[in-house]
Amino acid sequence: MILVRTLLLWLVATCVHAAPPAFAPVTPGRTLAFPADYGAHPDYRTEWWYATGWLKTPDGKPLGFQVTFFRSRTETDPANPSAFAPKQLIIGHAALSDPVLGHLVHDQRSARAGFGLAYAGTGTTDVKLDDWSMRREPDGRYRVVVRAGELSFTLRLAPTQPVLLQGEAGFSQKGPQAGHASYYYSEPHLQVDGDVVHAGRKQAVTGTAWLDHEWSSQVLDTNAAGWDWTGVNLDDGGALMAFRIRARDGSTLWAHATWRDGAGKVTQYGPDQVRFAPQRTWTSPRTNAAYPVATLLTTGTTQWRIEPLQPDQELDSRRSTGAVYWEGAVTVQRDGRPAGRGYLELTGYVSAMKL
């Protein structure tokens, strides 16, 4: 008991005298450099690697998948010499969308970085969380491994196109204030192969994926509730990314879109050129949140109709990030014709999102 009290007093004293860290700022004009920027940026507050995609089983059945690794720098004094000091946290989310089930199968994990069990490496993508991992191989392919209770998968994601820099050469504004921004790039049209274990059955899968990598120290305005985001692999070889940051009253604080057409031409759309118009909502029986799962997205003069693979794609991550959000596979039409497939993310509909 004396030892416990001594340890508690030491921890309190450490916290009282600890110097808060200075998080690295996100500023325009920085040139993203690869392969280094594939890796972690531990001086920034928040970072994530996010892969989503559509898979097909041998019998032609569609599945959606999502795996995200978060790295979060805490406010622990960086000069703290203890190997147990939680200076960096690693969090993982994984989900499988199966229309036969009618809802997501998902899991989550979190741990402090250290001891080789959880880390986000610099220099290239190399993230590990127990037996979950995402690693970029020397040939550019990603290997993603998830082992969980109700789902497991081992996937290989092979790039087929150049990196797509979002915003201003990778500087992505997220609000009216200069500091609300991130560094952000995407890798659309990743060819996928591997296997999925679900409902006690192992199946080979192929498909197409989208990978985002984003890092920041201050993303959201204090009046922000959350965001609507979509990333779409277009059938003509193009790629579309769009988002809006929502205020607490439901209005749009900021919006942006990037469209790379099939010939490789990139067009950026500012806040006044991007509009999300909900067409249909789905109300969760678990949280009572109403999500706009079908949306009409306008970028410039082009309209894209977004429809979900299934309505219930809500993910409860309160055990790791404290948030509940909707993250689901979607199809996209342009001018009434099929145009592509991707993912839609809807956050802040249960409670205001905090990063």
Residue ranges and their predicted role:
Residues 2-9:
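Sec-dependent signal peptide recognition
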Residues 19-355:
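Structured soluble/peripheral alpha/beta segments that form catalytic or ligand/cofactor-binding pockets
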Residues 13-15:
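N-terminal signal peptide c-region/cleavage motif recognized by signal peptidases
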